């Protein structure tokens, strides 16, 4: 679209823009167009930018200044152009003046009764606004919908938008009482963005330049006030003061909240901003942060806080309590209530103190539980020493319950001399002859009632010199002693310090008895495995019960049973001296009697007041028992000892009764019993087996050769004679050992020419074939059933034959 030439002010005629001759050539080509005649000042738009920087006036916009300084009868060179000048007379096609201000003045009804005006023309002189402000004609086919109401001029519309904030402040009403916090924030953002926006001098569209400055000329936005749910927003976005019937009371409470906002909302956290637009996720995140921060409350202030909150609940107003606390002054202002963020918000929203009281009660109960747990752990712990008891005594006044902490001594059954050994166990402590009643003596007396003194000796080789290093290597004993040392804190133990980490316990040589032993070895109930180390060589003792560990090595073991003060494990002398079974004429070894030693001090001897040696029997060898199972048998052992069973009585083994009579099952003949006397060995030597004597021991080939008399009798007759004399047993007679051995030998000899491993018959039957019933197919109307068992390393196969008339029965059924 072309532009019509225009004249320029003579003051600007000397100023030529760069490339003006190109614009002149372009304007000459477009001078005959319709748009150049409609918008005769379009060509001069590029002159406006230059004039804006040099001749800027705050009252008149730059474009208006440029239009006022131009004359439409002059071109860009300052010369009059006769061929491009528009006739100023009346025209039949176009209006003489296309300015919108004149149309608005005469109420022209064209363009759907709409009045358009440039925002820069507001307040300008009348001679400057007569030129049209269109830069483009817009769409060729414009569609305009007629409306009943007319749109006023933008200048009139801008002046009608009154700042409601200023009016509310004049009336004494704060502006935040009229709108919600989200609307306030939106309004504030719009005002800030409009205040920072400035008109750009490089804008080329008058439509955009007309729409944006409307915000710059207004100081506020009028937004309709909505107050749903009949509640007033307080100074915070999440707090609301519900309306009361008494307006004076509600206004006073609102003023009171605003005055005490600093004291009440000291812990408001991230929810304290009044211009924050809240949603569900933002509220949850804020609550989490407040709860994490409020959870770190000092527990020492809980008692005072509970009293302060209970006083506040009686008054029924948290704000009044806060003011009273501020007036009281002193150190009470430093304490804060340990309430959660949720309870605090509910209190601010609804004035409800139920959740806050519940939080306080929960915190108080948690503190009480923690204190009671500390008391129980201090009273029941076996690791507490005398020094720790003194510290608990000093702390007793601080505890709220005021319990007197005293050490508890467990009761253990003790064998009494004057009473029967089958009576119920009683508590009895051992008297120790010591001059000082120190803490260590009390601990050792308590420890002696719990544990048992074990006497371990090395008796195998009495020639071991005193200079030899003899140790006991036992992980079980070392762990038990380490646990005792941690419990009793005994630093003056007679054992090595290495046994805390090394399972080696040094043995002491006794010059009087010429033996090695372990002094003062107190162990709890259980099973212990050990080995002896003599000059670095591990071995086991034959005087102690033996067993094998998981690697197959021989180890010694012994068991400590509850209810005894002293035990000395050893094996029976009968097992050590000889492993031969006693004959009937010899007297069986008796169980060793109980040895009792006089009461003495623990430090003077390793025997205690009720020393009892509990020997082990060959029937009680180690078979995979564990310490836990032995400890669990404590109650059962005590009940068994109190019963009527005599555990210490002599064991009477059963005497075996022998007989010389042969059962009828093994008799061969007419059933007459044959008695064999023990004193008839010198009568005469036994006859060899024959047809008439000991036929079971005869060889089958020799027996039938004798019956046939050198071939005079055939085999069938000899078999009939044999069957007439001896009845047919369960198994055929040809299934004797010699017959089977001959078959096996022949099969092995035949397989020597081939591969021996594949053809040889394995005499060892797989265990999967043992104790299984095997059968064969029916042949010659006979079925056989067999079963193989193993007895003392040998295999015995029993075969049972039975007639099976299968074909005969089938033929009878078919007939």
Swiss-Prot record:
<feature type="region of interest" description="Disordered">
    <location>
        <begin position="581"/>
        <end position="616"/>
    </location>
</feature>
<feature type="region of interest" description="Kinase-interacting sequence (KIS); required for interaction with SNF1">
    <location>
        <begin position="473"/>
        <end position="716"/>
    </location>
</feature>
<feature type="lipid moiety-binding region" description="N-myristoyl glycine">
    <location>
        <position position="2"/>
    </location>
</feature>
<feature type="region of interest" description="Association with SNF1 kinase complex (ASC) domain; required for interaction with SNF4">
    <location>
        <begin position="724"/>
        <end position="804"/>
    </location>
</feature>
<feature type="region of interest" description="Disordered">
    <location>
        <begin position="363"/>
        <end position="389"/>
    </location>
</feature>
<comment type="similarity">
    <text>Belongs to the 5'-AMP-activated protein kinase beta subunit family.</text>
</comment>
<feature type="modified residue" description="Phosphoserine">
    <location>
        <position position="220"/>
    </location>
</feature>
<feature type="modified residue" description="Phosphoserine">
    <location>
        <position position="331"/>
    </location>
</feature>
<feature type="modified residue" description="Phosphoserine">
    <location>
        <position position="200"/>
    </location>
</feature>
<feature type="compositionally biased region" description="Basic and acidic residues">
    <location>
        <begin position="120"/>
        <end position="129"/>
    </location>
</feature>
<feature type="modified residue" description="Phosphoserine">
    <location>
        <position position="209"/>
    </location>
</feature>
<dbReference type="Pfam" id="PF04739">
    <property type="entry name" value="AMPKBI"/>
</dbReference>
<dbReference type="InterPro" id="IPR006828">
    <property type="entry name" value="ASC_dom"/>
</dbReference>
<feature type="compositionally biased region" description="Basic and acidic residues">
    <location>
        <begin position="12"/>
        <end position="31"/>
    </location>
</feature>
<keyword id="KW-0472">Membrane</keyword>
<keyword id="KW-0519">Myristate</keyword>
<dbReference type="InterPro" id="IPR050827">
    <property type="entry name" value="CRP1_MDG1_kinase"/>
</dbReference>
<feature type="modified residue" description="Phosphoserine">
    <location>
        <position position="643"/>
    </location>
</feature>
<comment type="function">
    <text>Beta subunit of the SNF1 kinase complex, which is required for transcriptional, metabolic, and developmental adaptations in response to glucose limitation. Has a structural role, mediating heterotrimer formation, and a regulatory role, defining carbon source-regulated subcellular location and substrate specificity of the SNF1 kinase complex. Promotes the PKA-regulated relocalization of the SNF1 kinase complex to the vacuolar membrane in response to various types of carbon stress.</text>
</comment>
<feature type="modified residue" description="Phosphoserine">
    <location>
        <position position="497"/>
    </location>
</feature>
<feature type="compositionally biased region" description="Low complexity">
    <location>
        <begin position="313"/>
        <end position="326"/>
    </location>
</feature>
<dbReference type="InterPro" id="IPR032640">
    <property type="entry name" value="AMPK1_CBM"/>
</dbReference>
<dbReference type="InterPro" id="IPR037256">
    <property type="entry name" value="ASC_dom_sf"/>
</dbReference>
<keyword id="KW-0963">Cytoplasm</keyword>
<feature type="modified residue" description="Phosphoserine">
    <location>
        <position position="33"/>
    </location>
</feature>
<feature type="modified residue" description="Phosphoserine">
    <location>
        <position position="198"/>
    </location>
</feature>
<dbReference type="GO" id="GO:0005634">
    <property type="term" value="C:nucleus"/>
</dbReference>
<keyword id="KW-0449">Lipoprotein</keyword>
<feature type="region of interest" description="Disordered">
    <location>
        <begin position="1"/>
        <end position="88"/>
    </location>
</feature>
<dbReference type="InterPro" id="IPR013783">
    <property type="entry name" value="Ig-like_fold"/>
</dbReference>
<feature type="compositionally biased region" description="Polar residues">
    <location>
        <begin position="32"/>
        <end position="42"/>
    </location>
</feature>
<feature type="compositionally biased region" description="Basic and acidic residues">
    <location>
        <begin position="587"/>
        <end position="596"/>
    </location>
</feature>
<feature type="region of interest" description="Disordered">
    <location>
        <begin position="311"/>
        <end position="335"/>
    </location>
</feature>
<keyword id="KW-0597">Phosphoprotein</keyword>
<dbReference type="InterPro" id="IPR014756">
    <property type="entry name" value="Ig_E-set"/>
</dbReference>
<feature type="region of interest" description="Disordered">
    <location>
        <begin position="410"/>
        <end position="444"/>
    </location>
</feature>
<feature type="modified residue" description="Phosphoserine">
    <location>
        <position position="494"/>
    </location>
</feature>
<dbReference type="GO" id="GO:0005774">
    <property type="term" value="C:vacuolar membrane"/>
</dbReference>
<feature type="compositionally biased region" description="Polar residues">
    <location>
        <begin position="1"/>
        <end position="11"/>
    </location>
</feature>
<comment type="subunit">
    <text>Component of the SNF1 kinase complex, a heterotrimeric complex composed of the catalytic alpha subunit SNF1, one of the three related beta subunits SIP1, SIP2 or GAL83, and the regulatory gamma subunit SNF4. The beta subunit serves as a bridge between the catalytic and the regulatory subunit. Interacts (via KIS domain) with SNF1. Interacts (via ASC domain) with SNF4.</text>
</comment>
<dbReference type="GO" id="GO:0019901">
    <property type="term" value="F:protein kinase binding"/>
</dbReference>
<feature type="compositionally biased region" description="Basic and acidic residues">
    <location>
        <begin position="72"/>
        <end position="88"/>
    </location>
</feature>
């Amino acid at each position: 679209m072309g532009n019509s030439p225009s004249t320029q002010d003579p003051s600007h005629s000397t100023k030529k823009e760069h490339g003006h001759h190109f614009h002149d050539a372009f304007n000459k080509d477009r001078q005959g167009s319709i748009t150049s005649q409609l918008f005769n000042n379009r060509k001069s738009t590029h002159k406006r930018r230059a004039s804006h920087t040099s001749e800027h006036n705050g009252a008149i916009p730059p474009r208006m200044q440029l239009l006022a300084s131009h004359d439409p009868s002059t071109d860009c060179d300052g010369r009059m152009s006769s061929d491009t000048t528009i006739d100023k007379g009346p025209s039949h096609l176009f209006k003489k003046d296309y300015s919108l201000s004149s149309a608005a003045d005469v109420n022209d009804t064209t363009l759907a009764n709409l009045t358009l005006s440039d925002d820069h023309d507001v307040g300008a002189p009348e001679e400057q606004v007569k030129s049209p402000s269109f830069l483009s004609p817009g769409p060729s086919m414009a569609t305009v919908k007629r409306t009943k109401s007319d749109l006023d001029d933008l200048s009139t519309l801008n002046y009608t938008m009154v700042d409601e904030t200023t009016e509310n402040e004049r009336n004494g009403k704060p502006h935040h009482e009229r709108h919600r916090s989200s609307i306030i924030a939106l309004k504030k953002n719009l005002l800030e963005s409009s205040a920072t926006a400035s008109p750009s001098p490089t804008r080329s569209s008058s439509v955009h330049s007309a729409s944006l400055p409307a915000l710059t000329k207004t100081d506020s936005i009028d937004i309709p006030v909505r107050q749903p749910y009949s509640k007033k927003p307080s100074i915070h976005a999440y707090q609301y003061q519900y309306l009361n019937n008494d307006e004076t009371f509600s206004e006073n409470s609102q003023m009171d909240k605003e005055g005490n906002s600093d004291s009440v909302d000291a812990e408001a956290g991230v929810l304290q901003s009044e211009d924050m637009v809240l949603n569900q996720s933002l509220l949850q995140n804020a609550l989490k942060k407040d709860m994490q921060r409020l959870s770190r409350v000092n527990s020492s202030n809980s008692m005072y806080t509970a009293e302060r909150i209970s006083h506040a609940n009686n008054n029924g107003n948290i704000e009044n309590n806060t003011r009273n606390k501020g007036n009281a002054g002193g150190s009470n202002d430093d304490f804060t209530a340990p309430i959660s963020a949720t309870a605090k918000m509910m209190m601010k929203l609804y004035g409800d103190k139920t959740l806050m009281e519940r939080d306080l009660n929960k915190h108080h109960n948690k503190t009480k539980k923690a204190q009671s747990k500390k008391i129980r752990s201090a009273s029941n712990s076996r690791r507490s020493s005398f020094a720790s008891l003194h510290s608990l005594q000093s702390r007793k006044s601080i505890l709220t319950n005021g319990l007197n902490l005293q050490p508890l001594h467990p009761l253990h059954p003790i064998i009494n001399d004057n009473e029967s050994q089958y009576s119920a166990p009683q508590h009895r402590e051992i008297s120790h002859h010591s001059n000082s009643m120190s803490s260590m003596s009390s601990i050792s007396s308590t420890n002696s009632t719990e544990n048992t003194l074990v006497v371990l000796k090395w008796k195998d080789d009495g020639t071991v010199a005193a200079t030899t290093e003899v140790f006991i290597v036992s992980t079980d004993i070392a762990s038990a002693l380490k646990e005792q040392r941690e419990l009793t804190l005994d630093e003056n133990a007679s054992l090595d310090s290495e046994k805390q980490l090394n399972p080696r316990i040094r043995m002491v040589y006794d010059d009087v008895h010429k033996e090695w032993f372990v002094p003062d070895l107190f162990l709890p109930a259980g099973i212990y495995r050990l080995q002896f180390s003599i000059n670095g060589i591990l071995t086991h003792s034959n005087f102690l019960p033996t067993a094998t560990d998981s690697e197959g090595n021989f180890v010694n073991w012994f068991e400590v049973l509850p209810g005894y003060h002293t035990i000395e494990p050893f094996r029976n002398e009968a097992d050590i001296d000889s492993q031969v079974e006693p004959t009937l004429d010899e007297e069986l070894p008796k169980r060793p009697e109980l040895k009792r030693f006089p009461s003495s001090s623990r430090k003077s001897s390793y025997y205690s007041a009720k020393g009892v040696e509990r020997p082990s029997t060959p029937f009680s060898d180690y078979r995979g028992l564990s310490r836990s199972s032995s400890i669990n048998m404590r109650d059962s052992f005590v009940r068994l000892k109190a019963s009527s069973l005599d555990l210490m009585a002599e064991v009477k083994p059963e005497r075996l009764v022998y007989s010389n009579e042969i059962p009828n099952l093994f008799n061969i003949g007419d059933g007459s019993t044959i008695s064999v006397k023990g004193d008839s060995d010198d009568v005469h030597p036994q006859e060899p087996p024959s047809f008439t004597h000991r036929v079971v021991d005869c060889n089958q080939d020799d027996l039938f050769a004798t019956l046939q008399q050198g071939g005079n009798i055939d085999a069938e007759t000899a078999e009939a004679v044999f069957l007439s004399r001896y009845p047919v047993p369960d198994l055929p007679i040809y299934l004797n050992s010699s017959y089977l051995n001959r078959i096996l030998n022949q099969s092995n000899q035949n397989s020597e020419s081939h591969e021996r491993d594949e053809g040889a018959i394995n005499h060892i039957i797989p265990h999967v074939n043992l104790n299984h019933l095997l059968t064969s197919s029916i042949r010659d109307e006979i079925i056989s059933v067999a079963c193989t068992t193993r007895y003392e390393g040998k295999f015995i196969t029993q075969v049972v034959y039975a007639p099976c008339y299968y074909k005969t029965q089938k033929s009878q059924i078919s007939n």
